[in-house]
């Protein structure tokens, strides 16, 4: 699994949660 991509997805998810 690509770590970088995983971190990018995680960061996007956290931002999405913050907005809600």
Curated annotation (Swiss-Prot):
Belongs to the peptidase M20B family. The gene is pepT. Its main location: other. Coiled coil: none annotated. It is found in: Cell envelope. Cleaves a wide range of dipeptides and tripeptides, but does not display activity against larger peptides. May have a role in the survival of F.nucleatum in the subgingival environment of the mouth. Optimum pH is 7.5-8. The keyword Isomerase does not apply. Binds 2 Zn(2+) or Co(2+) ions per subunit. One of its GO terms (cellular component) is cell envelope. Its EC number is 3.4.11.4. This is Peptidase T. GO terms for molecular function: metal ion binding; metallopeptidase activity; tripeptide aminopeptidase activity. Inhibited by the chelating agents EDTA and 1,10-phenanthroline, by bestatin and amastatin, p-hydroxymercuribenzoate and some divalent cations at high concentration. It catalyses: Release of the N-terminal residue from a tripeptide. Its cofactor is Zn(2+); Co(2+). Keywords: Aminopeptidase, Cobalt, Hydrolase, Metal-binding, Metalloprotease, Protease, Zinc. It is an enzyme of class 3 (hydrolase). GO terms for biological process: proteolysis. It comes from the Bacteria. The keyword Zinc applies. It comes from Fusobacterium nucleatum subsp. polymorphum.
């Amino acid at each position: 699994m690509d770590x970088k991509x995983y971190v990018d997805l995680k960061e996007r998810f956290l931002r999405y949660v913050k907005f809600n």
